[in-house]
Amino acid sequence: MQINELIKYMESLGLDIHTTTKARGHQGFFLDGRIDISNSLPEERLIPTLLHEFAHYIHSKIEKNINKTGGSLKIIFDTEKNLTSELFAVTNFVDYHSKCEKLIRHREMVKDSIKKLDLQIKEEFPNFQRSKKFKEFDRAIRGTKLKYLLKYDRVRIMPWFMFGKEEVLSINTIEKDFPNLKIAFVNYIRLKSLSRKQRRISNRISKLHRYYNRPTELFARLVEGLYLDKELTCKLAPNATKRFFELLEKGYYGELKFIFDNYVTIC
């Protein structure tokens, strides 16, 4: 399939296609009759991405406000069956980032580091519990500026007076800045920092899972998967692909039928 041929057909439907933009930092996006494909995409990603965004266009004609609502599988597949797990398997094939493997590994490394620090603190304070106040630590830092490092990894403390000196505190220089501070307390500050990092990573994973599980994204990646590898996609999602082709033949997906009739062989 030639990309120019596909663009020409889509433009004949009234779509505004752009392939020389940054696509808002994404591979592509669809909004209000316009499709943008990133100018930094490698050639082999152009057609799959264009089909992905065209699938959003088709979905938007069937179901309104998908950009806000994320759509509904019941509507786009016109069924009460739960097809989510099949569709997500296709998503994992189409976009390896959807597995969040790198983030999950990073989170596990952070969790291991937290456990090690926890054990080191307990060597000196056996009753230490992360979920409870560390009273010995609170007493030790009373009247110091170390409290800021319980919330931030690096802080700039501005002077009260115009000619005072700015002070910078960092978890990387605790031993140097506070040479008399017990190692257990240094470890506690670093443990709190790692706990914040763990939460950030978990939030990132949750955000990605919400994005990849949006019905409109699951549908678009099914279309993308059928172009990339029809046989594998049908194997990963037998019920979803069967329903997709039933509706495609009935004209439920409108102009998407022309794309499949001319460029994608039904499996």
Language-model features and meaning:
Residues M1-G14:
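Zn2+-dependent metallopeptidase catalytic core
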Residues G25-F30:
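Short, exposed beta-strand/loop patches in secreted or surface proteins that constitute
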Residues E44, S60-R105, A237-T241:
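Post-HEXXH active-site segment of zinc metalloproteases
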Residues P48-K61, A220:
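Active-site recognition of the HExxH zinc-binding catalytic motif
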Residues E101-C267:
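Pan-zinc metallopeptidase signature
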